[in-house]
Amino acid sequence: EPSRRQRQMCIRDRSRIFNIVWEEKIVEANWNGYLEQGESMTIEHTPSEGGRAIQLNSTLTLSRELIPLLLPEDNFTLSLDMETGWSTFSSTSQDNITENTSASIDRGDLNSYPESGYTLSADSKEALETLLLNQAGERFGQGEWTWTITADQCDPDTPVDGIDPDQGNDWELSVTVIVMVLRISEVGP
């Protein structure tokens, strides 16, 4: 039976050398729709598949009211639930009467920027990929992201009592996620 040292050498002999490179990728997504008061829409996506999410910028923008200066703007809520356990929300507001009502969810430093351009030994590319993508403290934002848009309050668009030709509002959600994508290539036995 081989000694422990001989077994370790055999394992090392089967290891292969891989070059590790992380490339920045900008993932953009846009959705739009129409919601009436009390309705919600749920959108699911997985922006960080095969990489690490670094930064998130998202904005929900509502269409303008028919008479924007006379009537209150509609109130919507944008919420985000990540599979990794982080949840947040933002309610629409209008900072300037010349701009559309909007809500934003922004967050930087979701994970740290990984080092790039080095080599590692491993038995397989798949094992190395699993190891690097699942490092402790670097898994924020992995898995499915669930966006929910809710029309909380949609005031009438005309000042005439009981008449509301538009009982909701059109909306657009724009999401940009900076992801560092892992690229592994074998460079030697």
Question: Where do the protein language model's features map onto the residues?
Answer:
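Single conserved hydrophobic/aromatic residue that forms the stacking wall/gate
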Residues: 1-11
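A short linear-motif detector with a strong N-terminal bias
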Residues: 2-3, 36-38, 58, 125-128
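A generic signature of intrinsically disordered, low-complexity regions enriched in glycine/proline
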Residues: 7, 78, 85, 127, ...
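Short N-terminal edge-element motif at the start of the domain
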Residues: 12-50
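Extended, solvent-exposed segments with strong compositional bias
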Residues: 22-31, 91-144, 154-161
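C-terminal edge strands of extracellular/lumenal beta-sandwich accessory domains
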Residues: 83, 134-189
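Short linear interaction motif-like sites in intrinsically disordered regions of transcription factors
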Residues: 23, 32, 87, 146-148, ...
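Acidic, Ser/Thr/Pro-rich low-complexity intrinsically disordered segments
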Residues: 34-114, 142, 149-151
